[in-house]
Amino acid sequence: MWVALGMLWLLALGGPHQAWGFCPSECSCSLRILSDGSKARTVVCSDPDLTLPPASIPPDTCKLRLERTAIRRVPGETFRPLSRLEQLWLPYNALSELSALMLRGLRRLRELRLPGNRLVTFPWAALRDTPQLQLLDLQANRLSTLPPEAAHFLENLTFLDLSNNQLMRLPEELLDVWAHLKTGPFLSGHHARLILGLQDNPWVCDCRLYDLVHLLDGWVSSNLIFIEARLRCASPRSLAGVAFSQLELRKCQSPELRPGVTSIISPLGSTVLLRCGATGIPGPEMSWRRANGRPLNGTVHQEVSSDGSSWTLLDLPVVSLFDSGDYICQAKNFLGASETLISLIVTEPQTSTGYSGIPGVLWARTGEGAEAAAYNNKLVARHVPHMPEHVALATKPSMPSIKEELALQNFQMDVPGEFSREPSEHQEAQMVRSLKVVGDTYHSVSLVWKAPQAGNTTAFSVLYAVFGHRDMRRMTVEPGKTSVTIEGLAPKTKYVACVCVRGLVPTKEQCVIFSTDEVVDAEGTQRLINMVVISVAAIIALPPTLLVCCGALRRRCHKCRTGGSAEASGAYVNLERLGHSEDSSEVLSRSSLSEGDRLLSARSSLDSQVLGVRGGRRINEYFC
């Protein structure tokens, strides 16, 4: 009986000890005696087939190493029974995620090493359960960002390795913690307060890296030591490989809009250009939208000025009443957004009499264009939006009648009051000259003009309408062109057409009146008239010409027979003497010229018979 009691006593003493010191089959365990006499157990598990942490790790384990295994995840509270654990090493596994409860109960943990895994994120809030943590090794993972709240859990660390990750930037809150170490006192004989590893990350060197670059610039504090201080840029491409010490970055700034016009009043059909500028670092993204939610009826252009300001332009080519309203310009970067409002008021077409010293003269603006036309004290121009366009060369002008010419004399373009032209605009308005009309068919006509002061980018507009009608159509001519063909005209109809620089009001000299039947028949009629005139002239001029030639030949023969000096005293005048005489005393009277001599003149009009005067001497030109 005493033997049985002894056996039970031994089992009672040895059972718990054997359970306390049990080592998992996949691991190796070792026990060492510390200086204070306590025991520290180390468990190392490196089985490549291990996919989860062992479930029966001895509770007295102080150091646990799970390395080079196939462990992909750690279930929550797996290590909670290990209340004496001080070092947890999980290097070079296949960990892709960690539970926020993984560190629950590890109040004594001082080292957490997780290098060489596949972690994209880290449960920073889990560090609340490890108040004595001093070393955190996260090198060679896939971390791309650090949240701002991570700074609250990293203040007590003395070693932090974030090298060889995918970090492009660091939060300002964390940089502020480290900047405090730079300015804090360092006590002699003490170790550095933080060893930091940030190398081998794809840093984006823009304004968001300003604080980190400034932190490394001229670093002399012994409170913080970098494992590798020569950090380098990975992007943008222009700065790839450049060391932080060689950068000159500017601090980030939120967008700030430039002051400008807040309200615009524009006539119907004119071209409106809304402009909005902003500054910011990085350069803000500019955009337009309407306050009422309607789509934009224009084109947006972006540009950057030499001082770094960003500009956006909204081009409204032909404004209508639907374009009236509030337009919002927004400038935005990662720091925030700024907006401004511009009001556009489109006025309806107006007509009024403007005298300017000339009674009965009327000015007008087109319904949807800046061009206008008025004649005979009537408003005749109103824009009709669409008209096909074709460019052709003109060859012959069409002259208006006397009545039409008088109508164009009263044709005046002007704008009253606040719309009066500046001198520069007046010069542009006079750019079109020598407008001519040529007809191709009964249904088309060509216009040509001269614009010597126009550039290659100057665009012209053509306004035309049936004579006396109010509806006027408009065509736009390509820049650099000085001719256009108007098609779709009615035969045997009188029209008025004006050409001017786009956006300006045409003058009366830039308008012409024509008729399609006159233009088409003019060429054939002119040819017939030319043929009749030439035939009649040949019949009338042939007998006198023969008579003159015979008389000249007879005088020449008579002179040869006489052999005298008749050529100086006769009625015949020597051509060389007349054309090259240097003596003013040899001036001949018109009465000394015979009718035959006059017929030999190269000019038959009255002005050709008058002796020209050049350089103080008279000159006559004659041709046989």
Swiss-Prot record:
Stretches assigned to the Ig-like C2-type domain: 267-336
A GO CC term attached to the entry: synaptic cleft
SS bond list: 276-329
Lumenal topological intervals: 22-527
Domain Fibronectin type-III stretches: 431-519
Record's bilayer topology term: Single-pass type I membrane protein
Deletion phenotype: Mutant mice exhibit impaired visual acuity in optokinetic responses. They exhibit impaired synapse transmission from cone photoreceptors to cone ON-bipolar cells, likely caused by improper formation of cone synaptic terminal structures.
Tissue specificity note: Expressed predominantly in developing photoreceptor and bipolar cells.
Cytoplasmic side: 549-624
Domain of life where this protein originates: Eukaryota
Residue ranges annotated for the LRRNT domain, each copy included: 22-59
Oligomer and partners: May form a homodimer. Interacts with LRIT2; may form a heterodimer with LRIT2. Interacts (via its N-terminal extracellular domain) with metabotropic glutamate receptor GRM6. Interacts (via its extreme C-terminus) with the scaffold protein FRMPD2 (via the third PDZ domain); the interaction leads to their colocalization in photoreceptor synapses.
UniProt-recorded name of the protein: Leucine-rich repeat, immunoglobulin-like domain and transmembrane domain-containing protein 1
